[in-house]
From Swiss-Prot:
Reactions catalysed, as given in the entry: 3'-dephospho-CoA + ATP = ADP + CoA + H(+)
UniProt KW keywords: ATP-binding, Coenzyme A biosynthesis, Cytoplasm, Kinase, Nucleotide-binding, Transferase
Cell compartment(s), UniProt: Cytoplasm
GO biological process: coenzyme A biosynthetic process
Encoding gene, per UniProt annotation: coaE
EC number: 2.7.1.24
Pathway info: Cofactor biosynthesis; coenzyme A biosynthesis; CoA from (R)-pantothenate: step 5/5
Residue ranges of domain DPCK in the record: 8-208
Family: Belongs to the CoaE family.
Single GO molecular function: dephospho-CoA kinase activity
Name of the protein this chain belongs to: Dephospho-CoA kinase
Length: 208
């Protein structure tokens, strides 16, 4: 049994880069996955006080149901201005961080994959052992996002503009997966999995 905290690999990338797809491959290898976006949405739609603060700030009204329409309406309003983004981050991220810390403390595996879009923007990279960047051509990134979310190109560009640039993100990377060929991606994930298991040995003692 593991008796100390896991080696933390942060997976980051822009919208539509394919983070969730690659995280799924890691999960097939039994690696614990923590997805900040999923946790954020669950908290936002389950904590009435947080959601009401957001609705009042943005001047919008929508269902409390955690459905796709509500998420799209909310995201469109949030990314209309920098002040809205900063406001959401200020009230939501402390709660999300607390939840993530609790999840990590209960992990019984040598390492975890923490999927977060705002790793660099929020200075969260200081809390991880290694950074895995998922990189993709901007045109593919935009097309994927439009098809997945059924939104306009302008909406996707707004979100991209609020995120750190591709070039700067890559400067933080210890490891990079170029998300183009799925068969190559799987092979790369398997290679990284072995490497992360090796790296994590420095951080663990096993209670036999």
């Amino acid at each position: 049994m593991l008796i100390n905290s896991p080696y933390i690999v942060a997976m980051t990338g822009g919208i539509g880069s394919g983070k969730s797809t690659i995280a799924k491959i890691f999960s097939e290898l039994k690696v614990p996955i923590i997805e900040s976006d999923i946790i954020s949405k669950k908290i936002m739609f389950s904590e009435k006080s947080i959601l009401n603060s957001i609705k009042n700030k943005l001047g919008i009204n929508f269902s409390l149901n955690n459905n796709k329409y509500s998420k799209l309406v909310l995201r469109e309003c949030i990314f209309e201005s920098k002040s809205s983004v900063l406001f959401i981050n200020k009230i939501l991220h402390p709660v999300v961080k607390k939840k993530i810390k609790k999840i990590i403390s209960n992990v019984n595996f040598p390492y975890i994959i923490w999927v977060t879009s705002l790793l660099i923007e929020e200075n969260l990279y200081k809390y991880v052992n290694r950074i895995l960047v998922i990189d993709v051509d901007p045109e593919i990134q935009i097309k994927r996002s439009i098809l997945r979310d059924n939104v306009s190109k302008n909406q996707i560009l707004n979100i991209i503009n609020f995120q750190i640039s591709r070039e700067k993100r890559l400067t933080f990377a210890h490891d990079i997966i170029n998300n183009y060929d799925y068969s190559c991606i799987r092979r790369k994930v398997f290679e990284l999995h072995k490497y992360y298991l090796f790296k994590s040995k420095k951080y663990f003692k096993y209670d036999m």
